[in-house]
Amino acid sequence: MTGRVKKTNPRLTSLITTLKDASRTGEVKIWRDIANRLEASTSAHAEVNISKINRYAAEGETILVPGKVLGSGMLNQSVRVAALNFSESAVSKIAKAQGTCMTIEELLANNPKGSRVRILR
């Protein structure tokens, strides 16, 4: 008998519920997409290195990672990065480049329409 595996991380389940609610009330599809990506198994969550953010992001852009940001590589520009988790080295490298680290919850509060956000996977 196959059943649906329930997430045991209370922060993650709360975030998924909040994103779905924001998607419904604001009719913003980006939050539904992120909620669906976070509902997938943990092994399917994104793991993005700083080097990939540096390659695909423009100066001052907002990047959303539905998973963890890792510290491999260099960051040469100031970007705002929202993610589920950050490694310690990623936080220090983003701060060194005068960028900003934030949670997905903070991004949702600051930008409820989800405009001008780039999703990296």
Swiss-Prot record:
Protein name in the entry: Large ribosomal subunit protein eL18
Cited Gene3D superfamilies: 3.100.10.10
Keywords: Ribonucleoprotein, Ribosomal protein
GO molecular function ontology, one term from the record: RNA binding
A GO CC term assigned to this protein in UniProt: cytosolic large ribosomal subunit
Species name: Methanosphaerula palustris (strain ATCC BAA-1556 / DSM 19958 / E1-9c)
UniProt cross-references to PANTHER family, sorted A to Z: 60S RIBOSOMAL PROTEIN L18, LARGE RIBOSOMAL SUBUNIT PROTEIN EL18
Gene: rpl18e
Homology family: Belongs to the eukaryotic ribosomal protein eL18 family.
Biological process per Gene Ontology, one example term: translation
